[in-house]
Amino acid sequence: MKTWLFVDGYNIIGAWPELTQLRDQSLEEARRKVIDYLSEYAAATGYETVLVFDGWRVKGNRGSSLENPYIEILFTPEGVTADMAIERLVAGLPKHQKIYVATSDRLEQETVLAQGGLRISAMELHNMVFTQKEAQRARIARQPQSANPLDAQLDEAVRRKLHAMIHEENE
């Protein structure tokens, strides 16, 4: 069973303190940062993640998507809010999927619950993302460090050939 995470991008940017502060300087940078955070989270959890940004007030906007290896990023067309897009996407999923929707919009939360999804507030998602980030840092810190990190990843036969080549050049 797949686990899905749908995220209202601007709602998250408006709720997370570090993103709100960044948004006040550059909305583009705040979007990039939320994409980075959610990409890392999706890579670590395996959740099918869809990040939706409102484009509903942009005249003539047809909507678009961005390429990302870990998450799907959608910009809604004119007249379609992120909430509306998320509702449609959730309604179109096959039954028996685990679905989380991250938004602090009360009406959206109720709609998601009615469709069988689970709601996550913006701050709950914040805690989940940063708890995962910290757990990953701790795992990396516990791993033994090699003087040559590439050397530790090489197959023994390849390592011997490389060492032989290095010694031939030095002679």
How should these model regions be labeled?
Residues 3-7, 11-171:
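Nuclease catalytic cores that cleave nucleic-acid phosphodiester bonds
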